[in-house]
Amino acid sequence: MKNFIKSMTTLVETLQALDQVINHEQTILCSGRVNGAALQHITEQKSSLLATVDYLDKQRRQHDERLKQSAPYSRQPEIAAMWKEVVQLTTKLSQINRHNGMLLGKQIAYNTEALAILNASQTQKFYGPNGQETVTGQTVRKISV
């Protein structure tokens, strides 16, 4: 039983750490100028924490099978309180992560539009001082045969 309580405590602590990371991610995404390196670091942190959560949840389910118990653990008040916190945190994290996904989608769309504008201006045809068409500073000569 002590191992189960320890696993549940670690699960709650890991979810709290994930909450901080996801909130930091949201701050970066809302800042207007997204720092790609910082976002990459956060993605790595999230992946690591989610792998830990998955491992701890598997341990929890194994303990449940062995001890013939199941969530919400109403017969064990200490564990029931931790389970309630796990449910609340996962609900909150899911909502924030969904919102961050929308923010990230908007940032990707913005970057895609900016790249399209930049690429279009590079292929735009102009006339040089000699009257010939130029493409981004290169003279294009038409030869008739």
Named regions from a protein language model:
Residues I79-V145:
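Short terminal interaction segments
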